[in-house]
UniProtKB/Swiss-Prot annotation:
UniProt cofactor note: Binds 1 divalent metal cation per subunit.
UniProt-listed NCBIfam families: PRK00346.1-3, PRK00346.1-4, surE
Binding site for a divalent metal cation: D8, D9, S39, N91
UniProt keyword terms in alphabetical order: Cytoplasm, Hydrolase, Metal-binding, Nucleotide-binding
GO MF, one annotated term: 3'-nucleotidase activity
Family per record: Belongs to the SurE nucleotidase family.
Class of the enzyme per the UniProt entry, highest EC level: hydrolase
Keyword Metal-binding (UniProt): yes
Name of this protein: 5'-nucleotidase SurE
Length: 249
């Protein structure tokens, strides 16, 4: 099995090295990752300049682009052999609920949706590396077992690992996405020359985080695994829209 590994924290981030170490004994792994932190890049592509891959001393490929750029190039000519699946992470920080709309980690996995295997996005719910071994364990476990998984084509599996030692993790729960409240207002700053600027604030707290959600599972000490689909159509709105359109002249 051949796996393309990507992330959004950057090619030198500890999480991607940990993911490679977790999977390399069981698969032929190649790493293509941004040359700098691209957190929050979502599914953006770089269209205003050329992309230049550079192979590092450890064999990883660094790219001056986004997480989606990395996977896009990997699946469309940069690699001599097409991977069987894409695995993204390990992100240092949660990708729960609405986070998946902004996450470069999740976006990298989404770009791998055309391959025969499901794509995985792994996140550790911490900015610290203490419990990376826990996330490594579950990445290894889930990816190794993926061939026994019967899911529709183009399924993306979003996995969040609680910030706990392995022995304290209670298990794995199948979850739906929760929802966050609105984020706090951007933080206004003024530079020494008097020019105003803004820092984007932290994401909002969980607003829909009850039982069955990814938020709840992680808070209770479980690994959450949420299947994502690419159909963003809001089917429940069809009735009201159909009636509304019928009344237009």
């Amino acid at each position: 099995m051949r796996i393309l590994i990507a992330n959004d924290d950057g090619v030198t981030a500890p999480g991607i090295a940990a993911l490679y170490d977790a999977l390399a004994d069981h698969a032929d792994c190649v790493v293509i990752a941004p040359d700098q932190d691209k957190s929050g890049a979502s599914s953006s592509l770089t269209l205003d300049r050329p992309l230049h891959p550079q192979r590092l001393d450890n064999g990883f490929i660094s790219l001056n682009g986004t997480p989606t750029d990395c996977v896009h190039l990997g699946l469309n000519g940069l690699l001599e052999e097409l991977p069987d699946m894409v695995v993204s992470g390990i992100n240092l920080g949660a990708n729960l609920g609405d986070d998946v709309l902004y996450s470069g980690t999740v976006a990298a996995a989404i770009e791998g949706r055309f391959l025969k295997g499901p794509a995985f996005a792994f996140s550790l719910v911490s900015r610290l590396t203490d419990n990376l071994p826990t996330a490594m364990h579950f990445a290894r476990l889930l990816v190794a077992a993926h061939e026994r998984l019967a899911v529709p084509p183009r399924t993306v599996l979003n996995v969040n690992v609680p910030n706990l030692p392995l022995e304290r993790v209670r298990g794995i729960q199948l979850t739906r996405l929760g929802h966050r409240a609105r984020a706090a207002a951007p933080v206004k700053v003024v530079n020494p020359r008097g020019k105003e600027g803004y820092w984007i604030s932290a994401a909002g707290d969980a607003e829909d985080g009850g039982p069955g959600t990814d938020f709840h599972a992680v808070m209770q000490g479980y690994v959450s695994i949420t299947p994502l689909q690419l159909d963003r159509t809001f089917h429940e709105a069809f009735g009201g829209l159909d009636e509304w359109l019928g009344g237009l002249k």
